A protein has these predicted regions:
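N-terminal module-boundary/linker segments of secreted carbohydrate-active enzymes
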Residues: 22-48
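Bacterial N-terminal signal peptides that target proteins for export
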Residues: 1-7
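N-terminal signal peptide c-region/cleavage motif recognized by signal peptidases
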Residues: 16-18
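Domain-level detector of nuclease and nuclease-like folds
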Residues: 38-40, 51-219
Length: 219
């Protein structure tokens, strides 16, 4: 289902915002037993507006979409915090930092979700990179230099043009904020071979219902 300072706080804030949109959580989950994956792409400029002191918001690189996580999902509910105890090596953290730029986020995603994948640490984050690499970011969202207001359907359409195998049933645009909501994340449902598939009803509930949203620029 759909989830959502210091480097560590990056992961905690994303988890807090995402979890509010999720529903039934599985307990006592067995690693590797799940139905599909959800790739969560977070729009970093929106995060940086809410937490400008975060490390990834003040470095030399400005990010657009980053990977929030690759989450094992079930048709109803989702596994989390499986009983796997394997530390994340520094080499894995540095190796994935171009798409997951916060150490705390990497640690959290492994502990909460990677442990339920049935994979080891290195293989899980290799799968994260592979999933991200299969998605083409629309040109209009690759480096916008000014804020754009548009309906969520326009963002969905842009992703489908850039990725013809995606559909409205496999892709969810989420937003957050009062008044004029901001683009928060794009969630893409993938089968266990990383091919697009329909999202479950729980995952689809995260769809932004606003008439329009703001896409903050990359600065």
């Amino acid at each position: 289902m759909i989830k959502t300072a210091t480097v560590a706080m990056f992961g905690l804030l994303l988890v807090a915002t995402g979890a509010s949109a999720r529903h039934r959580r599985s307990s006592d989950a067995e690693p590797g037993v799940f139905d599909y994956y959800l790739l969560s792409l977070s729009w970093s400029p929106a995060f940086c507006l809410s937490d400008p002191g975060a490390a990834e918001c003040n470095g030399p690189r400005r990010f657009g979409f980053i990977v929030h996580g690759l989450w094992p999902q079930n048709e109803s509910g989702w596994p989390e915090n499986c009983n796997v105890h394997q530390p994340v090596p520094d080499t894995v953290v540095s190796g994935i930092s171009d798409i997951m730029p916060a150490r705390g986020l990497v640690y959290h995603e492994w502990s909460a979700h990677g442990t339920c994948s049935g994979l080891g640490v290195a293989d899980y984050f290799a799968l994260v990179r592979s999933a991200y690499g299969r998605i083409n970011i629309p040109a209009s969202l690759s480096g916008p230099q000014q804020a754009v207001e548009q309906p969520p359907a326009a963002i969905l359409a842009a992703f489908m043009r850039a990725n013809p195998k995606l559909s409205p049933a496999s892709t969810v645009v989420s937003c957050s904020g009062q008044g004029a909501p901001r683009l928060r994340e794009v969630h893409i449902c993938l089968d266990r071979s990383l091919n697009p598939r329909n999202c479950s009803a729980d995952a689809a509930r995260g769809q932004c219902r606003a008439a329009s949203l703001i896409v903050p620029p990359i600065r």
